């Protein structure tokens, strides 16, 4: 969403992400994808900062002695769950949500705007800004584009690229454990 709104919140208009150029000037799907990945990396970076802060607070102020006593690795290592005693981290973690929605959204943009050229990006953004009111025919077209989870390579390839990017972006960071 930030890639299509110049890095601004749709609710407040506040600049909350990286500034982007006016999305109506994008001339290719690849430009939109690149903008999305820039925004994504920015959000991951700031999410990781928050996550590391939460992990440190848990370690310092919220030990889990009972749960640690029930975990064979914590007992073996003599360390609390929130101090890296477990085989697998149980503290605040970074999870990827929204893969299907993002893949579906990109599929609509790719198919309708850049392949079929049945709508402009400007028209699509206007439809989204109006929650599809007055754009029912466009909404029907968008709903007809292949959706993730139906074993369709068109959208599955987009989802795979998103998942791969997420994996490589997130695993570039290390947690406190």
Indicate residue ranges for each PLM-predicted region.
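Acidic, low-complexity N-terminal propeptides/linkers enriched in Ser/Thr/Asp/Gly that mediate export
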Residues: 115-177
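Structured mid-domain segments that build the active-site/substrate or prosthetic-cofactor binding neighborhood
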Residues: 1-140
């Amino acid at each position: 969403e930030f890639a299509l709104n110049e890095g601004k919140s749709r609710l407040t208009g506040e600049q909350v992400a990286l500034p982007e150029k006016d999305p109506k000037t994008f001339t290719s799907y690849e430009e939109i994808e690149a903008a999305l990945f820039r925004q994504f990396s920015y959000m991951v970076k700031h999410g990781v900062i928050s996550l590391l802060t939460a992990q440190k607070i848990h370690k310092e102020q919220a030990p889990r002695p009972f749960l640690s006593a029930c975990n064979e690795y914590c007992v073996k290592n003599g360390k609390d769950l929130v101090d890296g005693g477990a085989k697998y981290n149980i503290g605040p973690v970074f999870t990827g949500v929204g893969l299907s929605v993002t893949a579906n959204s990109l599929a609509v943009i790719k198919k309708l705007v850049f392949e079929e050229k049945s709508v402009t990006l400007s028209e699509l953004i206007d439809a989204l800004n109006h929650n599809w009111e007055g754009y029912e025919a466009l909404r029907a077209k968008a709903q007809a584009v292949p959706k993730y989870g139906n074993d369709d390579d068109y959208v599955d390839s987009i989802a795979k690229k998103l998942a791969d990017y997420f994996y490589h972006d997130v695993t570039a960071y290390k947690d406190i454990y």
